[in-house]
Amino acid sequence: MIKVAINGYGTIGKRVADAVSAQKDMEIIGVSKTKPSAEALIAVQRGYPIYIADMSKKDAFAKAGIPVAGSVEDMLKKADIVVDGTPGGVGESNKALYEKAGVKAIWQGGEDHEVAGFSFNAHANYKDAIGRQFVRVVSCNTTGLCRVIKAVDDAFGVVKVRAVMVRRGADPHVVKKGPIDAVVLDPPTIPSHHGPDVNTVLPHIDIVTMAMIVPTTQMHMHAITIELKKEVSRDDVLAVMRSHNRIGLVQPKTAIKSTAELKEYVMDMGRPRSDLWENGIFEASVNMVGKELFFFQAIHQEADVVIENVDAIRAMMGEVRDPETSIRMTNEAMQFTAL
């Protein structure tokens, strides 16, 4: 069994913890929190040992009825690998801690590529991650882009990608962040960081991205144009999308045309936390004009990287060397079939 620690049991960390726990070849040996919270109480209910960075706060946890198993350093001693789920920019400061502990580590897309020197997507570069000590799983938006660009490039060849990212303003539980009544260019300059981030995984792709933030919490939306190397039919493209085990098609018969309706649909399906782990491509939007492919896709910012973290763990530990085998193991353990 691969022994996994979660440093930062928040939006991503708690989801990765549950995903890891569902796997037959992994176990959670501990999670970390900085202060008592509802999430910490849920971790206790789930049976995850809780570790803290500042042992002077142990009494505060005790008063909240949350047992503390030890320090983060204690947790790392028991782990084969740690998934860093701390807020963007914080994870980099933990690198020295992981190096000292001699533990493998995975960071999230909020950190720069340089923190690990390798950025990961299971379908694109799993084999290159085998045996690595440090890996960064790219962000939710970049994950969604990499999945579909890689699939289309393998099938037809890609000349260039142009994409507009309409990003949610905050996660649903966040009350101190906006905007409330504005569309914010983020950044106002072009390109946004998403294109260069795709190039950390798919360096040969010509891609330019633009991004804005809007007053919603339920997923990002991408408007994507891909110029292909040859003319293909819409049916050819849809066949590639349907065959991908982490790309889902939102079918016209559902009458879904918004992220809110899609989130509700996924919740009604019984997904944990109403998580959309796959790309949600709106089938009606898929269109070919000459060699240009157009479509919209919804990306659930809290969820799509979770399954990528599980595959990154397997790759780094080196016991499963075939990407499709790991992807299948992850999906099946989570009872996940793409839309």
UniProtKB/Swiss-Prot annotation:
Residues the entry annotates as binding D-glyceraldehyde 3-phosphate: 139-141, 194-195
Subcellular location: Cytoplasm
Catalytic reactions on record: D-glyceraldehyde 3-phosphate + phosphate + NADP(+) = (2R)-3-phospho-glyceroyl phosphate + NADPH + H(+); D-glyceraldehyde 3-phosphate + phosphate + NAD(+) = (2R)-3-phospho-glyceroyl phosphate + NADH + H(+)
Active-site residues, as the UniProt record annotates them: 140 (nucleophile)
Pathway named in the protein's UniProt entry: Carbohydrate degradation; glycolysis; pyruvate from D-glyceraldehyde 3-phosphate: step 1/5
Binding-site residues, NAD(+): 11-12, 110, 168, 301
Swiss-Prot/TrEMBL keywords: Cytoplasm, Glycolysis, NAD, NADP, Oxidoreductase
Main location, first listed in the record: cytoplasm
UniProt-listed Enzyme Commission number(s): 1.2.1.59
Cellular component per GO, a single term: cytoplasm
Family: Belongs to the glyceraldehyde-3-phosphate dehydrogenase family.
Quaternary assembly: Homotetramer.
UniProt protein name: Glyceraldehyde-3-phosphate dehydrogenase
Organism of provenance: Methanospirillum hungatei JF-1 (strain ATCC 27890 / DSM 864 / NBRC 100397 / JF-1)
Gene: gap
